[in-house]
Amino acid sequence: MSDSSKPHNSSPNNVPRLLSHATSSQESHDERVTAVKDNIIESGDHLGISVEEQLALLDAFSHLELGQFLLKHHGLNAHWTHNVIAHRPTHYINSLEEIIYTQLPNVLATRERFGIFQRLLQELLRPDAVMISVPCGVMADLLLLDYTRHRDVKLIGIDLDKQALEEAYKLASQQGLENQISLVLTDAWTIDLAVQADVITSNGLNVYEQDDDKVTELYRVFYSGLKPGGTLITSFMTPPPTLSQDSPWINTDPKLLALQYVLFSRIIGATWTAFRTHQKTQSQLEQAGFTDIQFINDHMHMYPTVIANKPF
């Protein structure tokens, strides 16, 4: 890597904890599976899915690489986030893996959200634009755009996970964009973007942060990093009907939602549960200073995209 593109840490003495997939558990895989089994038995049937069926789901899930990672970490890292979005297996280990990649509502909403981001970001490409992704993960949101007419764009990826930045650099090299990319290892809440960005794109961080004030503060960081007239493209996860009467979810299959609940809540213990409504998200963005806020829903209204602008 060149000096301008290799990851560097702007806060080496104070590295905050990864929200998405950090784990301090010393449990072995077998110990974790046993603990989940006990929880399933104690919790009982769920919406037509018997304890025996849930235990069979756990067994099938524990044989998948994705399943083993989620059982340990309870959230997705950069590699597995990109895998869920982009991977199209030609062979499935078992029927559960096929359901996860082709039918699970949250996965389909995530893929649709990614496609919406790609369309919007492509439209925002301009000569000499500075585009920032935070947290960038493998940075597919920016690195998979078409830069045929915009080879002068500057791309900046910011993440707290060193492995994510390494994978982002690999993808940049594959795309022939290694000379346009800069990577920074730091916490999203502490970055100083020096009012340099034309576009900031952010996905997958607010869903792990339960504190509304901290999320609003994150939006303030983004606002301060944008040039006047700059644009933020972000997203959020809406609450399911089981948690809120204000849930906007539509076009969902009840059986698949029940399966998803068992996987996420009883088996994985998922940490991406910081759900917010459209109204709450709009309020947070307005508090941060953004105007002209627009929402684009996926067809299930699970994972909306938000476009927000910094006024001139």
Describe each region flagged by the PLM.
Residues 168-169:
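Conserved SAM-binding loop
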Residues 189-200:
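A short acidic, Gly/Pro-enriched loop at the edge of an enzyme's catalytic core
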Residues 198-213:
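A short SAM/SAH-binding and catalytic strip from SAM-dependent methyltransferases
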Residues 215-228:
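A short glycine-rich, Lys/Arg-flanked "PGG" loop and its adjoining helix->strand segment in the class I
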Residues 233-288, 293-295:
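C-terminal alpha-helical "lid/dimerization" subdomain adjacent to the S-adenosyl-L-methionine
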